[in-house]
Regions:
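Acidic-aromatic/histidine active-site loop/patch
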Residues: 1-17, 173, 246, 250-257
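Walker A/P-loop NTP-binding active-site region of P-loop NTPases
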Residues: 16-82
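G-domain G4 guanine-recognition motif of GTPases
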Residues: 23, 155-156, 181-193, 213-220
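P-loop/Walker-type NTP enzyme "switch/lid" segment
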Residues: 52-123, 220-229
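Inter-motif core of Ras-like GTPase G domains
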Residues: 137-158
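Conserved C-terminal guanine-recognition region of P-loop GTPase G domains, centered on the G4
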Residues: 162-176
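Beta-strand-loop-alpha "switch" segments that mediate conformational coupling across diverse proteins
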Residues: 200-229
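C-terminal boundary of histidine-terminating zinc-finger modules
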Residues: 224-240
Length: 257
């Protein structure tokens, strides 16, 4: 079992730019981005979420800014607006901001333009969280040239675990060998009945060190899809803050659902 023992006291690591990836869609990747962003924000960090899934915008709804968006990532990369025009502050927390994806993809994003943008944003935010499209190609290329670390989001089922392993291998081919695992939608009673894979088997199957485990909580995506706030003491936010601290190099015991 590949427990993450690399983050110990006195060994902080540079994890300012995080790429949230997944081998397949439907694993709750964007929800995890918002939760991790809130976990960072609650710890006093200034956070920027950047959504790359052109044509499938969703963060605007989850962050409660759908009615306020004028400019998006496509506008920014094409030079139609400044960074200050594209960055939107979320009402969920004053430290939480976002640049949302284009509603349609007019032209493929240029990797060099994306890299210049991310490099320019590093000095303005404590954490940049890149919400990548599902799949192996485009996501791994952007992560490889911009991110300090990639998080691989999976659910505990064999298909998702196999695709997560492919994502880990693809990231390494792109030169990003620092990746960690987030297991989402874990339901204890399903684990007991062996309907879902054992968490040890998930970790070994993906081949990435475990960073955090999030429970199956149907109300979370429902609330976030309406831009509704979560209480600061909600269990998933405690998990998100623990993940945030581990990313900062603190030795924090894994928080389980």
């Amino acid at each position: 079992m590949a427990w993450d023992s690399s983050n110990r006291p006195g060994e902080p690591e540079q994890n300012q730019v995080i790429a949230m990836t997944s081998g397949k869609g439907g694993v709750g990747k964007s929800t995890l981005c918002v939760l991790l962003g809130l976990g960072d924000a609650l710890r006093g960090k200034r956070v920027l979420l950047i959504e790359f899934d052109a044509g499938l915008r969703g963060l605007d709804l989850m962050l409660g800014i759908a009615d306020q968006v004028v400019y998006d990532l496509g506008d920014l990369l094409e030079g139609r607006c400044t960074i200050s025009k594209a960055v939107m502050e979320s009402p969920l927390h004053e430290n939480l901001n976002a640049i949302v994806a284009p509603v349609s993809l007019e032209a493929p994003m240029d990797l060099s333009d994306v890299q210049l943008l991310i490099d320019g944003l590093r000095g303005h935010f404590d954490r940049l969280i890149l919400d990548m499209p599902a799949g192996l190609g485009f996501s791994s290329k952007i992560a490889g040239c911009t991110a300090d670390i990639a998080l691989i989001a999976v659910t505990p089922d064999p298909v998702c675990v196999r695709d997560g392993a492919k994502m880990a291998q693809t990231l390494e081919k792109q030169g990003l060998c620092r990746h960690r695992l987030l297991i989402n939608r874990v339901e204890e009673k399903m684990l007991r009945r062996a309907v879902l894979m054992d968490l040890d088997a998930v970790i070994d199957g993906v081949g990435s060190q475990l960073l955090g485990v999030f429970p199956y909580a149907e109300e979370i995506p429902l609330r976030l899809s309406r831009g509704l706030q979560l209480k600061g003491n909600h269990p998933v936010l405690r998990i998100a803050q623990a993940v945030s601290r581990r990313l900062d190099g603190e030795y924090v015991p894994l928080v389980f659902p």
